[in-house]
C-alpha cells in the first residue's frame, strides 16, 4: 500500500511535465504531417493535436498522420531526412521572421553555398570572414588606420595648443611687469600742472553754481524751510521790498499745506 501511494505521488509530480512533453510532440507531429501533405487543408492541425492528446473521441485525423509519418520514415534515406529537417527549419524560420527571410534569405543561402565551412576553415575563422566579407573588412581596417592618423593629428593639435597657452601665459607675465613698471600710467593720463591750475580757478569761480551770494537773512530761513519745494517748481524769487509781506504769509501757508510743503 505504501508503494502504491508512493507511485501515485510520483505520477502526480511528474504528470504536468509528461503532459507538456506529450503536447509538444503531438503538435510537432501534426505540424509535420500538415507540411508534408500535398494539400495542407486536408489535415486540420488543431484536431490532430487534440486527438493525439486524447481530448477528442475520434482518432481519424491522428491515425492518418501516424501512417503518413511511418511511410515517410521508411521511404526516405538518412540524407533525405536530414535535408527534410533543414527544409522544415527554413520553413519555421520563414514563419517566424516573415518578410526578413523573404528579402534576405536567398542572399544568406547563396553565401553559404559559395563559401561552405570546412574543418580547417572553422579553426581559422578570420580567413573565412575575410573571404565572405572581404571588402567590408578592408574598409574597417582602413577606418582603423584613419582613426590612428586622426589620433596622431589630435595629439599634434593638443601640443600646439599647449605651446600657444604657454606663449599666452608668458605674454600675461610681460603685461604684469609693464604694469608694475609704469604703474597708473596705463590706467589714465596724468593732467599737466597748467590744466590743474585752470580747473582750480574754475572751481573757485563757478563751483557753487547753485549758491547765491548776498542773499537776505529772511531768504536763508525761507530756503531752509522750503528749499526743496523751490528747487522743484522754480518759483520766482521775491524782491527785498516784498520780503516782509512774504515772510508774514509763510506761517499761514505752513498751517494750510503742512506736510505737503516738506520734502
UniProtKB/Swiss-Prot annotation:
Q: How is it modified after translation?
A: Proenkephalin-A is cleaved by CTSL to generate Met-enkephalin. The N-terminal domain contains 6 conserved cysteines thought to be involved in disulfide bonding and/or processing.
Asked whether the keyword Disulfide bond is assigned, the reply is: yes
List the InterPro entries hit by this protein, alphabetically.
Answer: Opioid_neupept (IPR006024), Proenkphlin_A (IPR000703)
Instruction: Give each disulfide bond as a residue pair.
Output: 26-48, 30-52, 33-65
What keywords are annotated for this sequence in UniProt? Answer: Antibiotic, Antimicrobial, Cleavage on pair of basic residues, Cytoplasmic vesicle, Disulfide bond, Endorphin, Neuropeptide, Opioid peptide, Phosphoprotein, Secreted, Signal
Q: In which family does this protein belong, per the annotation?
A: Belongs to the opioid neuropeptide precursor family.
Query: Protein name, please?
Result: Proenkephalin-A
Amino acid at each position: 500500500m505504501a508503494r502504491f501511494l508512493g507511485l501515485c505521488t510520483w505520477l502526480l509530480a511528474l504528470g504536468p511535465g509528461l503532459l507538456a512533453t506529450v503536447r509538444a510532440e503531438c503538435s510537432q507531429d501534426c505540424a509535420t504531417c500538415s507540411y508534408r501533405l500535398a494539400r495542407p487543408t486536408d489535415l486540420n492541425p488543431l484536431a490532430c493535436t487534440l486527438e493525439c492528446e486524447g481530448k477528442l473521441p475520434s482518432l481519424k485525423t491522428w491515425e492518418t498522420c501516424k501512417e503518413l509519418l511511418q511511410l515517410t520514415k521508411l521511404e526516405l534515406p538518412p540524407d533525405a531526412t536530414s535535408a527534410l529537417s533543414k527544409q522544415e527549419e527554413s520553413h519555421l524560420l520563414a514563419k517566424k521572421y516573415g518578410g526578413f527571410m523573404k528579402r534576405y534569405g536567398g542572399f544568406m543561402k547563396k553565401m553559404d553555398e559559395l563559401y561552405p565551412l570546412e574543418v580547417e576553415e572553422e579553426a581559422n575563422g578570420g580567413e573565412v570572414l575575410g573571404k565572405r566579407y572581404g571588402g567590408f573588412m578592408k574598409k574597417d581596417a582602413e577606418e582603423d588606420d584613419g582613426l590612428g592618423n586622426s589620433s596622431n593629428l589630435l595629439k599634434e593639435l593638443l601640443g600646439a595648443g599647449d605651446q600657444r597657452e604657454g606663449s599666452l601665459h608668458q605674454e600675461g607675465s610681460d603685461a604684469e611687469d609693464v604694469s608694475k613698471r609704469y604703474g597708473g600710467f596705463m590706467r589714465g593720463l596724468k593732467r599737466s600742472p597748467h590744466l590743474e591750475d585752470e580747473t582750480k580757478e574754475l572751481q573757485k569761480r563757478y563751483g557753487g553754481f547753485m549758491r547765491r551770494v548776498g542773499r537776505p537773512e529772511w531768504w536763508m530761513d525761507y530756503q531752509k524751510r522750503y528749499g526743496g519745494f523751490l528747487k522743484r517748481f522754480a518759483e520766482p524769487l521775491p524782491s527785498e521790498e516784498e520780503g516782509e509781506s512774504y515772510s508774514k504769509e509763510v506761517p499761514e501757508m505752513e498751517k494750510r499745506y503742512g506736510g505737503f510743503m516738506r520734502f
